[in-house]
């Protein structure tokens, strides 16, 4: 046996040292001290960041919500059924991110951005933090482009602009979700990506919404995020932030997005539940002191960006449920003060057959007027006042039987205008058709039509226009203003239709 030379031995040792890799993974690890109701108290993670994602040895994940001197309060995603005292937890040193971009469009996701529609994984390399700073004043531009909902009462009286936050508020079962879904359906062909965030809804309700969006071809440009009533409070709390992160991607890439939060009352309740378990002091209505801040930091991320930033926009339609019409409760008043206006839906109107049940007296759009097209402004300029006077007159007629001719005429026209503003669900109307029917009502073309037949008159008018005078609709659509020639033509068309219309 030949002996190894000294030089060979040293070269072999040298080679071994060069190729030696120390496979060592450094991790900060803590232990679960207690776990209850989706919140874990952890000892031993001193360097953890606020809202950092933590990993449990059971495979569960959570975020650090409470940073105390000797422990960390962690909100666990899901129910964490296998977590118990003594379970190891390690840091990931990253904040929570969700997938963004065109890869998520057309999908149904949970609050963590994971697909729940059975269509396979989301293939994307683009992720965004769920907590981002809202754009500053200098990065914004005033709202000036319309975002049409296709609902006559909204587009005429409480117009919404791209980059606006418009609250939809009302009692249970007054058609709040329907208004939001109509707005999403109406964005077809408008290059607007829509995000619907369901918070604490029944699974069956969300399935119905997805079915409706698919039926009207709206899922092609929509994302649905679902944190249902059966999900944990943590998932319900995180869902809107995941949704807005996805919307911000389009806003920041010079595109337009619309986000619906359905609804923020349940979001506040989920946050209240988490805060109680984290032993944070309760305030008014037992909500924690920072409940205003969780909604303001969410809604401030909706904005119209300036030209230097690409002029993209993110429009928000938060929904809030009231109890017995009480808009002075804590959460409704908070969100009213954060948003740029509200659409108020009333139970009494809903049950009296006025649908959408929008109370035009209490509904307001603080910045949308600048975004409304001129043609709509021209036909609906006095509509709010006319409807207010009609309501006053209607209340007066309950006590007085004798009315002069002018009052009778005003009352009759008011009744017809109320009928004009009625609309079936899931049937948004293009703005040019809205202009035509509101013009017909405001200028007295419906005065000779019986109140019960106004809806029928409208249903027959639109096909007549499309068949015989499509150029009128086309001109309103392109010009966006009723000039003298166009108005004269519109009058002629309406007079001709009245001759052919039979009740």
Curated annotation (Swiss-Prot):
The gene designation is atpA
**Transmembrane domains' residue ranges:** none
Source lineage:
Bacteria, Pseudomonadati, Campylobacterota, Epsilonproteobacteria, Campylobacterales
Subunit info here reads: F-type ATPases have 2 components, CF(1) - the catalytic core - and CF(0) - the membrane proton channel. CF(1) has five subunits: alpha(3), beta(3), gamma(1), delta(1), epsilon(1). CF(0) has three main subunits: a(1), b(2) and c(9-12). The alpha and beta chains form an alternating ring which encloses part of the gamma chain. CF(1) is attached to CF(0) by a central stalk formed by the gamma and epsilon chains, while a peripheral stalk is formed by the delta and b chains.
Keywords noted in UniProt: ATP synthesis, ATP-binding, Cell inner membrane, Cell membrane, CF(1), Hydrogen ion transport, Ion transport, Membrane, Nucleotide-binding, Translocase, Transport
Can you tell which superkingdom this protein's organism belongs to? Bacteria
Q: How does it sit in the membrane?
A: Peripheral membrane protein
Binding annotation for ATP: 170-177
Q: What is this protein called?
A: ATP synthase subunit alpha
Which reaction is this enzyme known to catalyze?
A: ATP + H2O + 4 H(+)(in) = ADP + phosphate + 5 H(+)(out)
Which HAMAP family does this chain map to?
A: ATP_synth_alpha_bact (MF_01346)
Q: Which PROSITE patterns match?
A: ATPASE_ALPHA_BETA (PS00152)
Enzyme type, top EC level:
translocase
List the EC numbers from the record: 7.1.2.2
Organism (species): Helicobacter pylori (strain J99 / ATCC 700824)
Instruction: Kindly list the residues the record flags as site (Required for activity).
Output: 363
Q: Name one GO molecular function term.
A: proton-transporting ATP synthase activity, rotational mechanism
User: In which family does this protein belong, per the annotation?
Assistant: Belongs to the ATPase alpha/beta chains family.
Q: Does the keyword Transit peptide apply?
A: no
Q: What InterPro entries does this protein map onto?
A: ATP_synth_asu-like_sf, ATP_synth_asu_C, ATP_synth_asu_C_sf, ATP_synth_F1_a_nt-bd_dom, ATP_synth_F1_asu, ATPase_a/bsu_AS, ATPase_F1/V1/A1_a/bsu_N, ATPase_F1/V1/A1_a/bsu_N_sf
